[in-house]
């Protein structure tokens, strides 16, 4: 424990067994550059109130509550965690990394388990409480929305450290919380590099503000959301593989400019919805049909693969696609769609093929500039049957092998041309469609967005 800064920069081994409460605590900045750090704690393993800065070292952490946290709520340039390197094996009953303001990770390797893992989620995949959930620590929460932050590298700027406490008090406060997130921040999570293996009972990556992914390789199994931002969520590079989730990727404005993204979700694959999470077991929005201002899904690049039991791509506002490649294996029930939007859906570039059930299917709107097709086949196609779309010369334009049954498909490609006839082949079925306008459809499904995706409790 230190009332001032605490720096660990040796190459030796430090082992801390904190059977009563916290492991390593600094009331100011906690800085670690090297060493083998082993911490077993009844409460928080490592805390720097003003900041935590880690550039190297090997960490083996088992925490009764939180793993690594920074808690200063009084200054916008404090309360951050910056990690540029290191190897972390971290098991926490609550959050693994929790920053009151910004969590910035530029490199390192991370093997993280929280709350007993995704199998011990507080909610079942259908949104009902999981009776196996054992944590009993009240209501979760990170830092407040809109809190200021340090620069993008997570380095605090300006300001003097707070005055030393007048009392000789070595205690720090652990907020009581059922929160069992892997990477959590109050204003922003910024990931520019690193290798991540996450198994979390709660959200794998969570911000009360924004999430920015510009690099790294993330593999996550989540008992709730794979990634959740109450503000904007942007992915421009890196690999994101969400192998298990309730909703895969969620934010008010989700923008994908690049990277390789794969999502498996028991509800929506990508969900864009406004407002704050409520914690209710009712995972639906209050108004399922109205379009929400400031809510958008934008896909401008990258490769996106979705396997969702709910809506594949769901925006309670607009959906715009200008580039990238998207494949959606959507719902098998008619109450959800491979695409779902409440505003407009516009495509000007890129390639998309999305399969799902008949009933609530939607395609792109006629405000698009690239041709698209929404087509319902005569009967259901079995799982693992290859779908191909060929032109009149037999040239394959698109292909996809959905792993679930489906009957409706929406597709778009720069190769589609008006007046051309294309053949849709799946299993024993083969049907033709002639492009007769910017949107060609034989569907009798939904013609407007529904907004089945809602915000939920953090």
What are the residue ranges of the model-derived segments?
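A composition-driven surface/loop motif
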Residues: 1-458
């Amino acid at each position: 424990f230190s009332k001032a800064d605490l720096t660990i920069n040796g190459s030796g081994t430090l082992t801390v067994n904190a059977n009563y409460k916290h492991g390593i605590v600094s009331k100011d900045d906690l800085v670690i550059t090297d060493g083998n750090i082993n911490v077993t704690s009844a409460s928080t393993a490592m805390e720097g109130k003003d900041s935590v800065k880690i550039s190297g070292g090997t960490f083996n952490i088992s925490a009764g509550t939180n793993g690594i946290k920074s808690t200063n709520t009084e200054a916008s340039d404090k309360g951050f965690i910056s990690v540029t390197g290191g190897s972390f094996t971290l098991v926490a009953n609550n959050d693994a990394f929790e920053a009151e303001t910004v969590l910035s990770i530029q490199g390192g390797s991370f093997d993280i388990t929280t709350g007993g893992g995704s199998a011990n989620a507080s909610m079942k995949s259908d949104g009902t409480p999981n009776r196996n959930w054992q944590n009993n620590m009240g209501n979760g929460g990170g830092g407040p929305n809109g809190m200021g932050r340090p620069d993008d590298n997570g380095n605090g700027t300006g300001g003097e450290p707070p005055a030393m406490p007048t009392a000789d008090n070595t205690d720090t406060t652990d907020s009581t919380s059922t929160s069992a997130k892997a990477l959590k921040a109050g204003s922003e999570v910024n990931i520019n590099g690193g290798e991540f293996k996450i198994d979390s009972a709660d959200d794998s990556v969570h911000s009360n503000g924004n999430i920015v992914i510009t690099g790294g390789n993330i593999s996550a199994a989540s008992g709730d959301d794979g990634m959740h931002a109450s503000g904007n969520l942007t992915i421009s590079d890196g690999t994101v593989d969400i192998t298990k989730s309730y909703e895969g990727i969620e934010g008010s404005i989700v923008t994908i400019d690049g990277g390789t993204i794969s999502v498996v979700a028991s509800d929506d694959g990508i969900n864009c919805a406004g407002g704050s999470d409520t914690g209710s077991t009712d995972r639906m929005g209050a108004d399922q049909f109205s379009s929400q201002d400031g809510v958008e899904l934008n896909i401008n690049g990258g490769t996106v693969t979705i396997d969702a039991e709910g809506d594949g791509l769901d925006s309670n506002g607009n959906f715009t696609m200008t580039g990238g490649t998207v494949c959606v294996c959507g719902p098998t029930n008619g109450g959800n769609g491979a695409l779902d939007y409440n505003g407009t859906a516009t495509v000007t570039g890129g390639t998309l093929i999305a399969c799902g059930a008949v009933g609530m299917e939607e395609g792109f709107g006629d405000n698009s500039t690239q041709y698209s097709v929404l087509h319902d086949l005569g009967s259901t196609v079995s799982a693992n049957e290859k779908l191909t779309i060929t032109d009149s010369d037999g040239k394959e334009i698109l292909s996809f092998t959905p792993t679930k049954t489906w009957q409706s498909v929406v597709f778009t490609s720069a190769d589609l041309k008006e007046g051309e006839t294309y053949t849709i082949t799946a299993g024993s079925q083969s049907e033709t469609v002639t492009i007769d306008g910017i949107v060609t459809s034989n569907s009798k499904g939904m013609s407007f967005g529904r907004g089945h995706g809602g915000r939920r409790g953090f």
